[in-house]
């Protein structure tokens, strides 16, 4: 089983969350299943996401896609995400 762990900061969690949820179909197409959405205790705008990965190639392609980058910018992601593929 493979997983994808992502950490990034957002400008405003309340704005980011509905935009993240609206992008679910793209994550589904990339074989990413949401497992956890966590927020920092000291900084609630620091987000950690854990996904179960069904197809690593699809997930890597999606993670590097310009459309994801644009969606993240629109949702208010304010730093470069840290992304780790794990097993």
What are these regions (language model features)?
Residues 1-70, 74-87:
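Short S/T/G/P-rich N-terminal loop/turn motif that feeds into the first structured element of a domain
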